[in-house]
């Protein structure tokens, strides 16, 4: 049994919400998405929060939500792509569960996000270039906090979730030691 929380980090479009829901279902854990929690509690969408409060206002809300959610037990939490920007979020995630970094290359992220109007940071003339810049800035932070790194590429949700579980099951008898393993799933052609 996986008796620890699973926290998913990674760029927008890496599959955190989709894979997180699937992981929660097959492990019997409760699923939370920090962005959806923010929307639910404010009653408005993320783009509206960005319009009214700017990115800094949104990040403050995100820190509060993450600090609250990581106190729960038996959960899978999909964080927003920029959650790792705040040192307190990285600390909270590291201390309260196992952090899985879902990595995908920028072109794959672009294909997954290009038709989603709910992503204020991609409202730019060149969303692919913006994704590349965001990944360059955030990748070191994702890697810093990650216990496990999984390359999602073009793999189906079930395959990625099963790879996450395979890695997590290597820990037997309680919560794992941080940084005990890191695995990058190769996916040639992605």
Curated annotation (Swiss-Prot):
State the similarity comment: Belongs to the shikimate kinase family.
Show the SUPFAM superfamilies listed in the entry.
P-loop containing nucleoside triphosphate hydrolases
State the taxonomy lineage: Bacteria, Pseudomonadati, Pseudomonadota, Gammaproteobacteria, Chromatiales
Protein name, please?
Answer: Shikimate kinase
Its pathway, per UniProt, is: Metabolic intermediate biosynthesis; chorismate biosynthesis; chorismate from D-erythrose 4-phosphate and phosphoenolpyruvate: step 5/7
Q: GO biological process: what's one of them?
A: aromatic amino acid family biosynthetic process
Quaternary structure note: Monomer.
What is the organism field in this record? Nitrosococcus oceani (strain ATCC 19707 / BCRC 17464 / JCM 30415 / NCIMB 11848 / C-107)
Q: Which Pfam families match?
A: SKI
Its required cofactor(s), as named, are:
Mg(2+)
Q: Which positions does UniProt annotate for substrate binding?
A: 35, 59, 81, 138
Keywords of the record: Amino-acid biosynthesis, Aromatic amino acid biosynthesis, ATP-binding, Cytoplasm, Kinase, Magnesium, Metal-binding, Nucleotide-binding, Transferase
């Amino acid at each position: 049994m996986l008796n620890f929380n699973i926290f998913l980090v990674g760029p927008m479009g890496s599959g955190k919400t989709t894979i997180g829901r699937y992981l929660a279902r097959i492990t019997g854990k409760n699923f939370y998405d920090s962005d959806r929690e923010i929307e639910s509690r404010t009653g408005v969408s993320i783009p509206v929060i960005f319009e009214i409060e700017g990115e800094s206002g949104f990040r403050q809300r995100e820190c509060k939500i993450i600090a609250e959610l990581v106190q729960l037990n038996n959960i899978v939490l999909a964080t927003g792509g920029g959650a790792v920007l705040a040192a307190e979020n990285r600390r909270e995630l590291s201390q309260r569960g196992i952090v899985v970094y879902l990595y995908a290359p920028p072109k794959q992220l672009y294909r997954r996000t290009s038709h989603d109007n709910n992503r204020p940071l991609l409202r730019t003339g060149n969303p692919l270039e913006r994704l590349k810049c965001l990944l360059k800035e955030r990748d070191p932070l994702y890697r810093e906090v990650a216990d496990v790194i999984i390359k999602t590429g073009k793999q189906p949700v079930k395959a990625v979730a099963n790879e996450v579980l395979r890695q997590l099951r290597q820990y037997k008898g309680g919560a794992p030691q941080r940084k005990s393993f890191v695995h990058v799933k190769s996916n040639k052609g992605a």
